[in-house]
Amino acid sequence: TVYEASNVQVHDFDGATPHVTYEKDGQTHTLTCDFIAGCDGFHGVCRASVPESAIRTYERVYPFGWLGLLADVKPVAHELIYAHTDRGFALCSMRSNTRSRYYLQVPLTDKVENWSDDAFWAELRNRLDPEAREHLTTGPSLEKSIAPLRSFVAEPMRFGSLFLAGDAAHIVPPTGAKGLNLAASDVGYLWNALADFYNDQSRAGIDTYSDRCLRRVWRAERFSWWFTSLMHHFPETGAFGQKMQEAELDYLVNSEAASRSLAENYVGLPMNFGA
């Protein structure tokens, strides 16, 4: 493992001699390899190194962000709380029995420095139901930040000897909690493909890597988009859209079939789903 490398570049991934170059301590180093796994995130060099003519991207940027606060306070509940309110979305999550993470839907124009801890806790209280509000413990923040939300997919996910995985290939809004799940499944498919290649001299897994990943990716993208659309206020929602959200939430709570579908997608579909 090499840390604090700079000027990382991938070369000849569509040719016979794939390799990676990087600079460290004033020297240029080269790593020769059979394959390159592009697990370097949304802003990494791997996807950016693919010619524009060889890749297609799909993206939706949502018109709001999540203001997150981390604090050493007892969680309001041991289960996640998702709140859809007239004031916007809120999420309560526990990191441990003594540390909690909370989120508020805010406009993209908001600035962290304009949100005091007191203002955050007051707004969170306004978005919680009376029972949760009663159990809310407040305290000084350890960290506050605003994260934009987007849906993004790049196709395909393989270019010769270069494989994209995780955020390098796709982003989901955090509402559905599917980002790490998708990254792990990408790596699982890639591990199996490389194991078959080196153990059995089979390229079947390599050749089908992108299609297998993307089938799962788009299912998770659909769920994350749907859940985000359901739980948040959009500028164009209007009175009719608000009623549709309320009806959908009522259906989820009172229909066993709908609840099962939500649970199946939230937990994460099995690796061989639909195979």
Model-identified regions with their sequence ranges:
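Hydrophobic transmembrane alpha-helix bundles
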Residues: A37-G44, T98-Y103, W121, L136-I146, ...
